Amino acid sequence: MTSTQSSQEVLADHDTVGGDNTSNKAKSTNIFLRLIQYHYRVTKYEKSEEQVLRESKLLPCIPFNRWFLIPAAVIIQFCCGSLYAWSVFNQPIDVLIYGEVVNMAPITFYIAVGSFGLSRNGPMVSCLLGTTLFVVGNYITALALYLRLIWLVFVGYGITSGVGLGICYISPVSALQKWFPDKRGMASGLAVCGFGAGSIIFAKVQLPLYNNVGLPLTFVVLGSVYLVLMVLSGLVLRTPPPNFSVGSDQTENGKVVEAHANGDPPDKISLIDALTSNNYRFMYAMLLANSIFGLVVISRLANMTKEIFGKTPDEGATVVSINGLFNLGGRLCFSILSDYIGRKNCFIIMLTSQLIILGSFSTITTTQTYWAFLMTMFIISSCYGAGFGVIPAFLSDTFGATNIGSAHGLILTAWSLAGVCGGLTFTAVFNAYRDGAHPSDPHPYNINVWWIFGVVFLGWIALLFVTPTAKDRAFTRRPRSFFRSIINRITNRERSFEMN
């Protein structure tokens, strides 16, 4: 390829990647599987020398460095993190449109989450497309609030912005997994911790902004801020050049070649084999279970602090901000921790913690123990955020970094399912038990907890069947080796004593 040729996107050859068995499976007559295979097909980019040279510079006078991607990814995720602060708008939107609180606004949050997991066409172009949709969705929401049309709010924020959020969420994560094959856990954690940071800041900014300019103009101002920040950050995103390497980890044409230094590399399998494997199914159930309670809590946390515990709206917004800090901390700390103790072990900690909290939730709310409520909610938020920090590295370790973009995008539909089905179910049950009840009565929340407990328990069972990664196996061997060494020392001393 000469330097004058343009960059071409070429469909990866599944036959050569997966072997004869993969080829036969890829050519399945199952129409649904073939549609998935086409929609989430593996692609590679063959870059011209001209493009490689151009992308080697961030600016004409500044050479590009892979670490520039970290702040760009954090800023993009930071803007997307405003989704987590949506609960601040629940009551103002209901009052503006209906004149009273009718619990319709939270549904927009669930629809927005349900739009995640869509396909992309490369980090920079995808991010700019997602930004356009996200910003336009905010402007449509402003128009909907001006006209007082709740269905247009659903279309604007729930669908249009939701699709844009989904595209912008995955683009930097996929790029960082390719640029940082030596630090997958850290890279995925840094990429998504901006989401938590966004919820902290926007939860505090949105309420004063609404009080000063009104609800419709709030979305106009926010949309304009998103436009500037996300476009500038999106222009930084790119894929690695051909044969990019870091230590013993190498990429070819932007595709990562696994290194034995990071553990046993996964077999070279096609994307369709990865998506239809038992491991992927169990991981899907695992992520859904880890997401469902966190989604419900985040969208109603401000309401619970005000209704059950009688706190002020300002304190409710503060709690949402602090909750976002724990969300951020969970994403970053667990993802880094997973580089040492393993991805599966981290998910075992997350789901077990949630089961314990769900079992004690009714007691905490009934007795109105505020400090215990805050502690459990912050732990739930940490575990919820941690799932999104660990899952990209978990997928890379299990199925290979070549498949990470599409595998990550599709598995986020588990989050969508938890948001839509779980959120709407929660709302239906909540409204049914809320009729005639006092606003401070926690029973509508408590009754919902038990079906969520069942979902999380099933996800915990599914997690047990997920194949552990090399890091998981190495970590579980350490305690055995430690105790074995102690036993050997004691045995050797006894033998030495007997000989003497």
What are these regions (language model features)?
Residues 2-80, 263-281:
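Cytosolic juxtamembrane N-terminal segment immediately preceding the first transmembrane helix
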Residues 86-93, 272-334, 388, 419-426:
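Extracytoplasmic gate region of multi-pass secondary transporters
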Residues 93, 165-180, 187-188, 301, ...:
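Intracellular juxtamembrane helix-capping segments at the cytosolic ends
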Residues 113-123, 331-343, 430:
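Helix-to-loop junctions at the C-terminal end of transmembrane segments
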Residues 132-146, 353-366:
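C-terminal ends and interior cores of transmembrane alpha-helices
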Residues 137, 150-167, 288, 371-386:
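Hydrophobic core of transmembrane alpha-helices in multi-pass small-molecule transporters
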Residues 195-244:
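Helix-loop-helix hairpin linking two adjacent transmembrane segments in secondary transporters
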Residues 283, 293, 308-394:
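C-terminal transmembrane helical hairpin of 12-TM major facilitator-type secondary transporters
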